[in-house]
């Protein structure tokens, strides 16, 4: 019943909109200068009630501190938090190239991801630290990465990142959020990978060679008219009925929210975060990049490869509230 005494009709789109599941806002909010990624998995004797309590406290703390938080739940943990499980939610399995190069997309599937972004590195640190301490004896940190905004959304290679995203928030939501009425409605599938760049090898190439590898110009990210079959764009810019045929409509099905990182030992790269309303397009692009089904391998993998890879699901706000 509405506040005015009228019973809501779920078949009425105007009324249904009032109760549609809400995607986690931080997926689409403007990213802060500082990012913090923490991956965890349960330890022996983990208490589910404690984990749920820490998740609630973390959400409240981030809201209080002005931190954008995305919570990603792995395939093993999600059924313990909710019965609303999206279709075709798989673990990240290592993908190995078949061309004898030894290149692979490494799978390191974990159970829980915190992604925090804000202008305040100190607040990010304190908030994630408190959550980790509260989870001791229940979940262990598998890996963490601190990233940042580099220039005008640049990758460490000097190329603009995220050019291929759907244009506008409405288009991004249409691509990234499970539609109302489907299992997992309001949620989003995540591909989280830490890519490691070989910048020394990359910088030995001319700009023209680099542009052929990406399939875009370096200064302004313009699509090259002639795409080499090994270009990155040829593997990830999927189009209706084709892969990189510019005459066909683009399959605007992925929202990228990636940032670069630099570790104290000189390791640099990109923390790749992609959101999608189904998981299949995320898996499809990875298989294409590594030529796993007999195609030409993406030459970008000669200069960058993932040290980790996990698939998660970011449940709706309502699902998290009920967990």
Labelled PLM ranges:
Residues 8-19:
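Short, Lys/Arg-enriched N-terminal segments with co-localized hydrophobic residues
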Residues 19-323:
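Long, histidine/aromatic-enriched segments associated with O2/redox biology
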